[in-house]
Amino acid sequence: MSWHDVLFGFDGRIGRKTFWIALVAVMAVELGCHAIAAAIEGERLTSIVSLAFSYPEFAIMAKRGHDRGMPTVIPGAFFAISVVIDFLFVIGAAGTSEEPSALLLVLTVPWLIFALALIVDLGFRPGTPGPNRWGPAPASGRPHGNGRAE
């Protein structure tokens, strides 16, 4: 599977190694963009940056979820909450860092629990052995599909 497919496609499965490499790389770039956005504009632009990075993060988590036998709707629900939280910041309805809105607080607690559960499940538990409805098991450390190492 190419890196383009890992970052932007929703078909297939990826193993834990590819999941961690892709997720950490995307989040590192996102963090750098957040720093630049915060220096320029603040929370609103930072939230727009988060929205832009939601797509590749969702694609990565969806494919890793496929390897675990998880339907796309589970990481999709997580990202739906993420998008709502970011949108609250973009429209100015999230309050401030000192006084967050009640809606933001109500959404943030389940989001944090969901995030922790997804990271544990996707990042540390092995995938389903053999093929499943999303394709063959990713070959850990061996060439897979297009000859690139998984």
Show where each model-derived region lies.
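Membrane-interface extramembranous regions at the lipid-water interface
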Residues: M1-V29, E57-T72, V120-E150
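Membrane-helix interface segments in multi-pass membrane proteins
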Residues: V29-P56, F78-A115, E150
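Pore- or pathway-lining transmembrane helices of multi-pass membrane proteins that form conduits
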Residues: T72-F78
